Amino acid sequence: MSYTQKVLEELKARYPEQPEFIQAATEILGTIQPALDAHPEYEEAALLERLVEPERIVMFRVPWVDDQGKVQVNRGYRVEFNSAIGPYKGGLRFNPTVTLGMLKFLGLEQILKNSLTTLPMGGGKGGSDFDPKGKSNSEIMHFCQSFMTELYRHIGPNTDVPAGDLGVGGREVAYLFGQYKRLTNEWTGVLTGKGLSFGGSLARTEATGYGLVYFVDEYLKSRGESFEGKNVVVHGSGNVAIYAVQKVAQLGGKVLACSDTHGWVEDPDGIDYTVLEHVYNKKRSGHDKGVTLAMYVDEKPNAVWHEGDGRGVWQLPCDIALPCARENTLLLEDAQALVANGCKVVGEGANMPTTIEATTYFQENGVAFMPGKAANAGGVLVSGLEMSQNAEHLSWTFEEVDGKLEQLMRGMFHNVDDTAKEYGQEGNFVMGANIAGFLKVADAMLAQGVC
């Protein structure tokens, strides 16, 4: 039994109730054995055993009062996973599906993702099973203030810097930041994704979607191709999807379809990101109950709305597929449909949206598969640039931030590509990303001793 298999079997026995975490660990550990073979000192230092266990987990109750005066109680978490290369960095997710296992999966992925950015950021993740959907602004503010009243003692600009994630946008980050400032009497860059009027960075909103497209475009360039004339399908219609759609169009491609939890929309003229943005903002406002992507056809009469599972987008013929919604939303049967319909490139805009079976099928059938820990790192990358701006007490222009984002994402592709080639796995970008991200963290942990 190999070192990675041994550690994985121990994890499965220890955490049988955390399937998402086991899935992430399986995907990562299953690809880094070549690096471990080249560095036997890692096993001697029990480095993997330390890597897969968080340095610290904070769990707490979050009591708050709703608009009817009734006390509600949710559960809050912060998984401070690894700080070998910098302060813990990773988003907060507010969603009823949030569990400790899910946050450990996201935190483990975040370690390698942050390492790949080349910026000094460790890995962490947090959140709550609170559901912001259908809540008033007042209720969301009360919840965020209660959440931060416990979290504030565990974070700081040089300790742990949270950001937004699913269910946590600019509004929630602002409420969290305000409460942190109130409790500590300090204005520090303790959160990223802030508003522009209080320390936020230009291009942060666009960063994940733009970064995804820059990464995929650099792959296409390495093959002597471009987005020009390519047909693209996108799963999702949130922040990542909107700006991926915009950047694809700017580079000459056409997005044929996108989706939400109620169905999917197909536009033969190409999805208009401004309409997507309008629908997304109405959803986020909290004033319009029942807003869905079906509204798209009100403004674009040539478009067709398909009620049902948003995974219907995977049935369309396309050159490039960009899953930008949630984990495990591109299944084996979807991969089979995409391959049958001519898809050549898949770039993950979300965290682990593709199942292991689907990923394997893509790789076995010659599809260039770009894993999320590299392809969607644009968001955390610009979060790191926001931390730099806060530390310098400066604000950079949109063009400066976007330029750094593009440069770093394109450089990241070559790091991943070169690492895959170095370990005899040319074209295996999953292995390239995992090994490249792992090596930097592993060397830092080794140098710092048993800690």
Predicted ranges, named:
Residues 1-202, 440-449:
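N-terminal ligand-binding/catalytic initiation module
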Residues 8-9, 26, 100, 104-108, ...:
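Predominant activation on well-ordered alpha-helical scaffold segments within soluble catalytic domains
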Residues 52-54, 67-71, 120-122, 188, ...:
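Solvent-exposed alpha-helices and their adjacent loops that cap or buttress functional pockets
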Residues 263-369, 374:
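Rossmann-like adenosine-cofactor binding region
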